[in-house]
């Protein structure tokens, strides 16, 4: 073997066999540190969850090497016979999980899935209705800073000021006055049950499509803990992470064959090129997990834990927007503790409790300050926390916020936060992740 060939072989051996730690210790170190953070912190961000090792393996597989523009059986590249199997499994499992006739599993994100529906069903300048961001909606539901708010005429609906519940009379009135082409239901910070039937009645009355973005509650729908929008909506979108516990990505469901064709064309070639086959594999695995009986117990535990956390926080003098929760999340009004969301997020973070600042309905504070935090139970429930643990977590949160109130500064109360941090590390140590003990 020549020196050149030997060098090429050695280089090839390194390329195919060397570990990440050997090739890129900086990235390896960042990932290792993030794993440590996840192991030793309590994750309360409502949109986050923890995937199984099987999902990690699928998403980190050699499927990342394969281009597969098009759909199963109709690809623009050769060599797709095995990725076709993967995508077909994902589609069939999604349809079974949600009782839908059609599923597109290619959207790369929640924003892109919603954009694809707009591309399929609307024209620039058309009117659609969506939940106001300040009432718990999403950027893609018509926020002026988002494409959805720039390309379309948006009419926003909201919650009532007295009880922070959806004002369905207002939805009906706005629909009659504005004759939208599409009504979008669903949100990112609404803790109560959605009345899909009433939304469909309003949509039918004005001749609008009903689109439901169930990204946050899809796992609860799949687990039987929230009414399904699929029988009522013309089209449903959902992310595949959050309460569904899969990889980060999106999905679109419908029971209408004509809409399905428009959706498929909007996703590809309208919005995306080659799908991420390794992510679709992860989606398929997560859907299979969600079809198992134990996922129904998981979904029930998510809701039970959220209610326990909300009640514990209320017992410590905090206000919960709308008075409580029917799903996986809650908005905590911090004003009784004279705290802002910005300060609370930072203080809780120093105590190893991760959450996000969040505006509350009719919030007097600026969006980057806020009067509230949003808390969710999917990740902690995946980890194994039950009602007892979430009551303890609620008490720890109150302890930090009380310390913050005494300190009355951005720096917080170091002694209280350190004491809580030690309790958090002890708690998380009892619920190891990915086979790790300690």
Curated annotation (Swiss-Prot):
Pathway: One-carbon metabolism; tetrahydrofolate interconversion; Amino-acid biosynthesis; glycine biosynthesis; glycine from L-serine: step 1/1. It is an enzyme of class 2 (transferase). Disulfide bonds: none annotated. (6S)-5,6,7,8-tetrahydrofolate binds at residues 133, 137-139. InterPro entries: PyrdxlP-dep_Trfase, PyrdxlP-dep_Trfase_major, PyrdxlP-dep_Trfase_small, Ser_HO-MeTrfase, Ser_HO-MeTrfase-like, Ser_HO-MeTrfase_PLP_BS, SHMT-like_dom. The modification N6-(pyridoxal phosphate)lysine is found at residue 242. It catalyses: (6R)-5,10-methylene-5,6,7,8-tetrahydrofolate + glycine + H2O = (6S)-5,6,7,8-tetrahydrofolate + L-serine. One of its GO terms (cellular component) is cytosol. It comes from the Bacteria. It holds the Pfam family SHMT. Its EC number is 2.1.2.1. Its cofactor is pyridoxal 5'-phosphate. It is found in: Cytoplasm. Keywords: Amino-acid biosynthesis, Cytoplasm, One-carbon metabolism, Pyridoxal phosphate, Transferase. The keyword Amino-acid biosynthesis applies. Homodimer. HAMAP family: SHMT. PANTHER family: SERINE HYDROXYMETHYLTRANSFERASE, SERINE HYDROXYMETHYLTRANSFERASE 1. Belongs to the SHMT family. Catalyzes the reversible interconversion of serine and glycine with tetrahydrofolate (THF) serving as the one-carbon carrier. This reaction serves as the major source of one-carbon groups required for the biosynthesis of purines, thymidylate, methionine, and other important biomolecules. Also exhibits THF-independent aldolase activity toward beta-hydroxyamino acids, producing glycine and aldehydes, via a retro-aldol mechanism. This is Serine hydroxymethyltransferase. It comes from Brucella melitensis biotype 2 (strain ATCC 23457).
């Amino acid at each position: 073997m020549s020196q050149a060939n030997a060098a090429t072989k050695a280089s090839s051996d390194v390329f195919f066999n060397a570990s990440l730690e050997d090739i890129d210790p900086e990235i390896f170190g960042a990932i290792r540190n993030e794993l440590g953070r996840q192991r030793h912190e309590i994750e309360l961000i409502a949109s986050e969850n923890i995937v199984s090792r099987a999902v990690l393996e699928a998403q980190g597989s050699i499927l990342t090497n394969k281009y597969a523009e098009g759909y199963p059986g109709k690809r623009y590249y050769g060599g797709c016979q095995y990725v076709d199997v993967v995508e077909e499994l994902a589609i069939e499992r999604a349809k079974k999980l949600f009782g839908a006739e059609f599923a597109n599993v290619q959207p790369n994100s929640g924003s892109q899935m919603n954009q694809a529906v707009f591309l399929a069903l609307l024209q620039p300048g058309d009117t659609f209705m969506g939940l106001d961001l300040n009432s718990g909606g999403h950027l893609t539901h018509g926020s002026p800073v988002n494409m959805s708010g720039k390309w379309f005429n948006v009419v926003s609906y909201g919650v009532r000021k007295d009880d922070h519940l959806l004002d369905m009379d207002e939805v009906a009135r706005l629909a009659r006055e504005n004759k939208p082409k599409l009504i979008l239901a669903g949100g990112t910070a609404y803790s109560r049950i959605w009345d899909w039937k009433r939304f469909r009645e309003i949509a039918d009355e004005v001749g609008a499509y009903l689109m439901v973005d169930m990204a946050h509650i899809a796992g609860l729908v799949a687990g039987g803990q929230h009414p399904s929008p699929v029988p009522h909506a013309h089209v449903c979108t959902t992310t595949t992470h959050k309460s569904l516990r899969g990889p980060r990505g999106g999905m679109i469901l419908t029971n209408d064959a004509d809409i399905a064709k428009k959706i498929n064309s909007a996703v590809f070639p309208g919005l995306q090129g080659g799908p991420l086959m390794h992510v679709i594999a992860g989606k398929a695995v997560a859907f299979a997990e969600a079809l198992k009986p134990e996922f129904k117990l998981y979904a029930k535990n998510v809701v039970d834990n959220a209610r326990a956390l909300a009640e514990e926080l209320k017992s410590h003098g905090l206000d919960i927007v709308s008075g409580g929760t029917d799903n996986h999340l809650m908005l905590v009004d911090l004003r009784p503790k004279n705290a802002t969301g910005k300060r609370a997020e930072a203080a809780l973070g120093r105590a190893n409790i991760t959450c996000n600042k969040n505006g509350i309905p009719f919030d007097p504070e600026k969006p980057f300050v806020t009067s509230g935090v949003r808390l969710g139970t999917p990740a902690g429930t995946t980890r194994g926390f039950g009602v007892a643990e979430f009551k303890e977590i609620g008490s720890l949160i109150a302890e930090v916020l009380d310390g913050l109130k005494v300190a009355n500064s951005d720096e917080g109360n170091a002694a209280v936060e350190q004491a809580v941090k030690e309790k958090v590390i002890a708690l998380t140590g009892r619920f190891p992740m990915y086979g790790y003990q300690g």
